[in-house]
Amino acid sequence: EFNSENSGENIEIGYLVNRQEKGVYEDIIKDPIDYLRPNRLVPENEEFSKIAKEVVAGKLGQLAQARALYDHTIDRMKYIKYGDGWGKGDAVYACDVKTGNCTDFHSYFIALARSVDIPARFAIGASIPSTRNEGGVDGYHCWAEFYTDGNWWPIDISEGDKCSALSTYY
């Protein structure tokens, strides 16, 4: 029983996890309009619009445009966690500093995607390396999803940056 008398005590919780690869999946909501709207950390601005339009120029279809934005983000950003400001998912910070963690990579991508009318959103969970069958989870991990043709497409740009051999996998 949990109550104030045992507050502060350590507890151990175990889970059995069935890991599955997340692939493209159909939209249940059917209205991705909310994922085009700016917010405090992923705002609309002229810089995002300018960059995104340059990156997608000549690309036909949102799938090709999203891939171009992915490639641009992986080329521009570096997975480096130091200094002040990283890890907040601030797209302006990520655009200016060009470094950060998964949150920063994906906020930048989402800002660019939304600038060219591609709905995009964060997804968050845990990253468990495929080579490890048991043990602890080191913390949260996030990725982005973009919407086109009735489906959400998950992408993981920061993992693609950390492991260039997998950059085309994500």
What are these regions (language model features)?
Residues 18-21, 76, 99-102, 127-130, ...:
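Solvent-exposed loop/turn segments at secondary-structure junctions
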Residues 5-9, 59-62, 114-117, 148-151:
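A short, structured loop/turn motif at beta-sheet edges
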Residues 4, 17-21, 148:
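Non-catalytic surface loops within mature trypsin-like serine protease
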